[in-house]
Structures are given as C-alpha cells and as structure tokens.
Amino acid sequence: MSRKLIPVLLVLAILLTACSNPSTPQTVEVTRVVEVTRMVEVTRVVEAPAQPAATVAPATPAPAPPAPQAPGFGETLKKVTARGKLICGVNSQVPGFGFVDSSGAYAGFDVDFCKALAAAIFNDVSKIEYRPVTAEQRFPALQSGEIDVLIRNTTWTLVRDTDNGGNFVATTFYDGQGMMVPKSLNATKLEDLASGTICVQKGTTTELNLADQMTARKIQYTPAVFDDANSTFAAYAEGRCDAVTTDKSGLISRRSVLANPDDNVILDVTMSKEPLGPMVRQGDDQWFDIVKWTVFATIAGEEFGVTTANVTDMAANPKTPEMRRLLGADEKVDLGAKLGLSKDWAVNVIKGVGNYGEIYDRNLGPATKTAIPRGLNSLYANGGLLYSPPFR
C-alpha cells in the first residue's frame, strides 16, 4: 500500500468512529488526527531528507568597467597636442597678472599658469600662443574654441559657471573689490563719494558690484563706463572721474604705474568676494581635470617644499608616499596616465614655473612693484585658504 494513502485512511477511520459514538468529544479525535498527521509528516521528512546545497567558492569579482565618457572627452588635449601649442586667453593690461613687459613678452601671475599647463602637456613652457581678450571678448572666445583655456583674472560666479558654456576649475587668487581715489579728495569711505563720478570697466562683476553697493548704501553716483582696463585707468589718471574701482589686486598694480603713486589711496573697504581662476569650455572632462590638477600641483609643491631648484632631487628621493605619487616616482601608481599625461608631468610643471609660492613671489611678491601681501592666498597651514586635494 502506498504510504501516501495512510493519512487519508486514518482520517476516514476516525470520522467513522466519531459518527458511531456521538458521545465522544470530537475535540479529542481532532487532536489525535493532528498527532497522527504530524507523525506521518515527520516520517516523510526522515525518509526524504533535504540534500544540503553544494558549497561554491566565491568567485573573484570582475574589475569595474571604465566610466562612460562624454562625446567630447579628450578632444581638447588631442587638438592641442596635434597643433603643437596651447592657446591661452589672457589679459594684457594688468601689471603683475597679465601684461606685456618691456621686452615684448607676456608676463604675470596668470600668464605663469598658462606656462604651467604647457609644461604639463609638452614639458616646454614656450609652446603657447597668448591670445589677449577683453572682459567682453573672453567668454565668446572660450565658447567658440578660439582659445583652449581662459586664465585672465576672471571671477567665479554662478551665472558665469552655468550660462557661458564654461567651467571654472579652481581658484588661483582670492581677491575683493576696492576703490581708489586721489589723496586730495580726503575720502575715507564710500559715502564720501556721494554725487561723484566713478570709473569702471564694462562687462565685469566690478560694474555690477558697484551698482549693488551704492544702491544698498543709498549713495547717488555717476558711473563712467569704459571698454577696457587701459581706458578706465587713463580716464582716472586724467581726472575725468573722482574714483576708480576694480579688484584690489588690480588697484594695487595700477597704482604702481601711475605718475605719482603716492598721490592715490585705496580705501579701506572691501565691496565683494572675488575668487579668480582659470576657466575651460564645458564638455571635455579630461581637459577640465588637466587644468585643475595642474593648479593643484603647484600648490602641493609649495606644501611639500618642492621647488624649481630641488624638484629633480625630490623626485629621485621623495620623502613621503604622497610626494612620491605627485612626482611620478611610485612604481605602482601612475597619476599622469589618469590625465592622459606623462608620469612626470608634475615634475615638469614645477621645473618649468615653480610651485605656487614661487609663482606668487615672482609676480606679486615684496620685491615686485605690485607687492601684494599674500593674505588669503597663503597656504592653509599659514592661515590662508590654499591647499591641494590629495594626490592619490
């Protein structure tokens, strides 16, 4: 007889017994059925035990696939290397930052970051074409591809970061807007300029900030707007306005070349925050990374004490694991390859232009005419805002 029929026959037998003896409580019989059923089920389990699943050794996880790349990824570096030079949009009218020196060569703090980028790509700071652009020309020049990168005392703002087809990569100089006046005016605050005329350059955050500040303080004034920096400061020097406004660094550099610098004072007022830095065209993340990490390499160089004079020795005998990675001395790690550059790209940058501190001192330090105190542009360890993300 099939074992599967046993529970059924037992149930039938119990039901028949219950019908023939109605005085017997049915609850007892139900209990017996449950007990029998349980016994049968246990028997079945014992007779047909479940087989344990075979143990399988964990497989080695497959490497993660590379992140998908946007259509424009790598196009700028290909274009620059095929051309054999970098086209850098710069200012030609701000001493200390971007100007043409007495020998006819471009020089300045911003210009040196163009050179740093050329060193990272070509290991040659001379492979650059400088393209001077005004405040109004700079964004169209970047959008159209006329220039590869814009490094021209440009303030990082939300609108510029979203509406102009470009991305800011890092802040190279922390500044703030100021106001310069003739000492003879005896002005000490913005309110002293009420009903006056103020020279300002068109197409700049300076023009917008001036309007914001004077409106907030309810000061009536007349703006005298000019197309470029030279025209703006020429008008001030000629006495066509009572004051001139731009970034404080620009005021300091411009005052240094006036006929009588000491006859002019910069008011003790800061009208805005002005983080200045390079800008690249949107759509090429590799190029964005190259420019960004070139800036950080100069800052890290100063943090680690790597200079133009000792970079070769430091690369041969790096003192820390991070310095080893930065200078391409780690046999297992090639950070340059992540950027599409050579393994020693950061060595080439520091060898070509120096670390951030060297760049600053050469163009804006105490031995220069401009002589701008570092202030916020000091390393974080020295009370400033500058530090590099980790090189790892």
What do the PLM-derived regions correspond to, one by one?
Residues Q69-L150, L341, Y356, L379, ...:
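Extracytoplasmic small-molecule ligand-binding "clamshell" domains
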Residues M1-E75, K79:
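Intrinsically disordered, low-complexity Ser/Thr/Pro-rich tracts
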Residues I87-G96, Y106-I121, T155, D175-F233:
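Bilobed "Venus flytrap"/periplasmic-binding protein-like clamshell domains
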Residues P66-P71, K115, A119, S184-A187, ...:
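Extended ligand-binding regions for polar small-molecule ligands
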Residues T76, F113-C114, Q137-L142, A229-A235, ...:
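Short, hydrophobic alpha-helical packing/hinge segments within bilobed ligand-binding/sensory domains
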Residues K332-R392:
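C-terminal functional modules
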Residues K115, A119, N123-D192, S249-T270, ...:
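Acidic, polar ligand-binding/catalytic clefts
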Residues T81-K85, A118-S126, Q143-I147, T155, ...:
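Sec-exported extracytoplasmic/periplasmic mature domains
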